[in-house]
């Protein structure tokens, strides 16, 4: 069974002034299988952010359905949405979203604190994750004391510590330099190889070339998709670049 199923999702906004209707998503349908690493790409205004907000249960579609591990997100009570999100989804953001008044360790623990876990349970979960991500020596430091790449590794640890069914990454390399980007993409690959499902929205061809599948959104619809198959990162990079050129020049779906 798919870990994520998106079926006919449409999102229509009404503008504040004038009451005009804006269709951000027309009819988006796709599925993500357990253990997949999927990238979503598209030009600004294509609907990527709207789609991610709906998948994260931060917004609701005008029509259509989203299922996470068979659970219809529209059937979750408002009072349970935050708990469902915390227990089932891990988030990695462009700007890290770490609290400067908390140590790196406490930032990572935060979802488990909210879930009422004991310190012993939190420590047991953190140790192997911190070792894998190479942040054990940083745990007592504060976000303002570490580099951007180290902050993002802390954010990845926070996403992993709840054992999420799906990690949603929103432009995770956007605020990183080239070296930190390479390191994060290497870590994402390692995490994915352990069976973790990842869905990443990105403008970066380099980041997308590490995924096993790339979906392209244009004018609120899935326009095209590429599968890695046996291709190298370099070969997929070129195919992604060619597809983005086609998108920009108004090419036809293929």
List the model feature ranges, each with a label.
Residues 56:
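Helix-to-loop junction immediately C-terminal to a conserved catalytic motif
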Residues 64-72:
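Conserved ABC transporter NBD signature motif
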Residues 102-110:
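Short coil-to-helix segment of the ABC ATPase nucleotide-binding domain corresponding to the Q-loop/switch region
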Residues 142-146, 150-152:
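Conserved ABC ATPase signature
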Residues 161-165:
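A short, proline-enriched helix->beta-strand linker immediately N-terminal to the Walker B motif
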Residues 167-170:
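Catalytic Walker B motif of ABC-type/P-loop ATPase nucleotide-binding domains
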Residues 221-245:
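Conserved beta-strand-loop-alpha-helix hinge in the C-terminal portion
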């Amino acid at each position: 069974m798919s870990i994520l199923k998106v079926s006919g999702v449409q999102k229509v906004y009404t503008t504040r002034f004038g009451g005009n209707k804006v269709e951000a998503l027309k009819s988006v349908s796709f599925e993500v299988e357990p253990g997949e690493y999927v990238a979503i790409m598209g030009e600004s205004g294509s609907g990527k952010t709207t789609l991610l907000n709906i998948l994260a249960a931060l917004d609701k579609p005008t029509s259509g359905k989203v299922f996470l591990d068979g659970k219809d997100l529209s059937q979750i009570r408002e009072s349970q949405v935050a708990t469902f999100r915390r227990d089932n989804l891990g988030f990695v953001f462009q700007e890290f979203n770490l609290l400067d008044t908390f140590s790196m360790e406490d930032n990572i623990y935060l979802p488990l604190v909210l879930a009422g876990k004991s310190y012993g349970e939190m420590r047991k979960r953190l140790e192997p994750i911190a070792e894998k991500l190479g942040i054990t020596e940083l745990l007592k430091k504060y976000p303002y004391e570490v580099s951007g790449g180290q902050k993002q590794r802390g954010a990845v640890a926070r996403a992993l510590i709840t054992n999420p069914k799906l990690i949603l990454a929103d432009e995770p390399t956007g605020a990183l330099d080239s070296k930190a980007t390479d390191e994060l993409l290497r870590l994402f690959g390692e995490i994915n190889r352990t069976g973790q499902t990842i869905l990443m929205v990105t403008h970066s061809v380099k980041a997308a070339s590490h995924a096993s599948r790339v979906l392209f959104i244009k004018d609120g619809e899935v326009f095209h998709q590429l599968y890695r198959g046996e291709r190298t990162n370099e070969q997929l990079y070129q195919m992604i670049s060619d597809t983005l050129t086609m998108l920009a020049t108004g090419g036809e779906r293929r």
